[in-house]
């Protein structure tokens, strides 16, 4: 299966530079649905509605706002955001190596694979092997899609994996969650230890499946055999019709609804 790259550049540290491509390591297996109109099966479209003026808002009148209190916002323009946005990274520059065992999994965000590009295969394999033997990971800052990430680059099954990490101020404290220490009977401790020992097994994710997703897919396959899928009607677009005309039409509908309340 061909995997589409979402970024290409180099991974570097000291005098080493390896050309790589970033690809997704996880394909989310959720079953997604579109919302349809039950009368004609047309896919429903999302529109922006202003409750104050009771009208649809065209794209050129939509801005961002940062909420600073109940019903209080600080407007901000695209130009202002662009002025503080970091430049897109061309290099994943490792600033230090760490022991991966020291990284609490709660800091893990999204995993990606780093695929070697032409000319970088030998250095790539060498880095994979060294990091595997030492169980070390490279720590770096990396900009993707106008967001600056903290990332860990590690060796996984013969390949380099890049894991985006949460920043420390994003991880919530467990101080209010952990129960206070108390006296636990020796037989209770012994029983828990025995249960854990009896249930020990090697990690094998292939033993488990998303049963709900599988049942939904079976349901869909059954429905396809029993009943042909419906087709949404073609929407004829009149000459000159565009977003402004659509908004005007929707506003007219809203006015009619208000009259009939």
Curated annotation (Swiss-Prot):
Domain Ku, first and last residues per copy: 12-171
Pfam family, one: Ku
GO biological process: DNA recombination; double-strand break repair via nonhomologous end joining
GO molecular function, one term: double-stranded DNA binding
Keywords for this protein: DNA damage, DNA recombination, DNA repair, DNA-binding
HAMAP family documented for this protein: Prokaryotic_Ku (MF_01875)
Subunit annotation: Homodimer. Interacts with LigD.
Protein task: With LigD forms a non-homologous end joining (NHEJ) DNA repair enzyme, which repairs dsDNA breaks with reduced fidelity. Binds linear dsDNA with 5'- and 3'- overhangs but not closed circular dsDNA nor ssDNA. Recruits and stimulates the ligase activity of LigD.
Family: Belongs to the prokaryotic Ku family.
Descriptive protein name: Non-homologous end joining protein Ku 1
Natural source organism: Geotalea uraniireducens (strain Rf4) (Geobacter uraniireducens)
